[in-house]
């Protein structure tokens, strides 16, 4: 009986991870559509080992989401909708809080938008240089 319960927990966790992957894929698409940029400016990476999701973006997105009120509000509202979390904007950091812990979902998720330029070659090549880290606690 104990093994069955453990298996169900693993399946639930896997389903939760799949949900987050789908939700962030949709977020990425909506951000690209909203900014009306023909080429892709956002991509995401989910690391199952660290359980962290990264949304990578170009400098244009890094500037737009904070400086264009409509873009900022749209992203915040969409994140509220897909995450089921209360979302608070604190400067460049979005803080998610969830009232009830469930299926290992942390009570607080900090989403930190930051420009992260590794070297000038990446910048000149137009590579993705920023990332949004979801830090679970």
Curated annotation (Swiss-Prot):
What drives induction of this protein's expression?
Answer: Expressed in the late phase of the viral replicative cycle.
| Listed GO CC annotations | host cell cytoplasm; virion component
Which keywords accompany this UniProt record? Host cytoplasm, Late protein, Virion
Primary subcellular site in the record, as a coarse category:
virion
Where does the signal peptide begin and end? Answer: none
Localisation per UniProt entry = Virion; Host cytoplasm
Asked if the Swiss-Prot or TrEMBL record annotates the protein with the keyword DNA-binding, the reply is no
Record's subunit section: Interacts with host TBK1.
Provide the family line.
Belongs to the asfivirus A137R family.
Function text: Plays a role in the inhibition of the host innate immune response. Mechanistically, promotes the autophagy-mediated lysosomal degradation of host TBK1 and affects IRF3 nuclear translocation to block type I IFN production.
Name assigned to this protein: Structural protein A137R
